[in-house]
C-alpha cells in the first residue's frame, strides 16, 4: 500500500482498515475501522479532509477527492463500486454507489440509497434517505424496498469479510 504524508499531514488509518498494495491514500484522510480500499484506488486528501466511515469499501479503480472548503464524507457500511468518482460530497450510511457513478461537489446522498451504475449526480444535488437514484443527470425514481435496503447492507458485510480474507491470505508471488 502507498500511504503518503503531505505537508506534514498523514492519513489516519484504523488498525483494522485494509488498503491494497496498489491503492494510494494521501494527506488529510481518515479510514475508520473495517474499511477497505481496493486495488488501483486513489484517495487524495490534499485540499480538504476525506472521512471514510466504519465498514465502508472503496472498490477497484475509484477516485476520491475534495476541494478546499468542500470535504468528502462517506458514512458507515457504504459500498463504493468499481471506478466510482466521489468529489467533495456526502454519502449517507449503508448506501451503495454503483459502478462508474460520479458524485460531484456539495451533493448529498441520504442513508440507504442506491446510486445506479453510471449515474451523474451534479453539484449540490440532494437526495432523501432510501432513494433509488439513476441517470445523467441523476434523478430519484422511487424509494427502495426493505429487501433492497437489506441487499445494500449485505454488500457492505461481504466486503468486510472479503477484506479479512485478503488480509489473511493474499500473497504476492511475482
Regions flagged by a language model, labelled:
Residues 23:
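Compact, Lys/Arg-rich rRNA/RNP-binding cores from ribosome-related proteins
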Residues 26-32:
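N-terminal glycine-rich anion-binding loops that anchor highly charged ligand groups
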Amino acid at each position: 500500500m502507498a500511504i503518503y504524508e503531505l505537508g506534514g499531514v498523514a492519513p489516519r488509518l484504523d488498525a483494522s482498515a485494509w488498503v491494497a498494495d496498489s491503492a494510494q491514500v494521501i494527506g488529510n484522510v481518515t479510514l475508520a475501522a473495517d474499511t477497505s480500499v481496493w486495488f488501483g484506488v486513489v484517495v487524495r486528501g490534499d485540499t480538504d479532509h476525506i472521512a471514510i466511515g466504519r465498514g465502508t469499501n472503496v472498490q477497484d479503480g475509484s477516485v476520491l477527492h475534495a476541494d478546499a472548503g468542500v470535504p468528502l464524507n462517506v458514512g458507515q457500511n457504504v459500498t463504493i463500486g468499481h471506478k466510482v468518482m466521489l468529489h467533495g460530497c456526502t454519502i449517507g450510511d449503508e448506501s451503495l454507489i454503483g459502478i462508474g457513478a460520479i458524485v460531484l461537489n456539495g451533493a448529498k446522498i441520504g442513508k440507504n440509497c442506491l446510486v445506479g451504475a453510471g449515474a451523474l449526480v451534479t453539484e449540490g444535488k440532494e437526495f432523501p434517505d432510501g432513494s433509488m437514484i439513476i441517470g445523467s443527470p441523476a434523478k430519484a425514481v422511487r424509494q427502495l424496498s426493505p429487501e433492497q435496503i437489506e441487499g445494500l447492507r449485505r454488500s457492505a458485510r461481504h466486503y468486510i469479510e472479503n477484506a479479512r480474507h485478503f488480509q489473511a491470505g493474499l500473497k504476492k508471488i511475482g
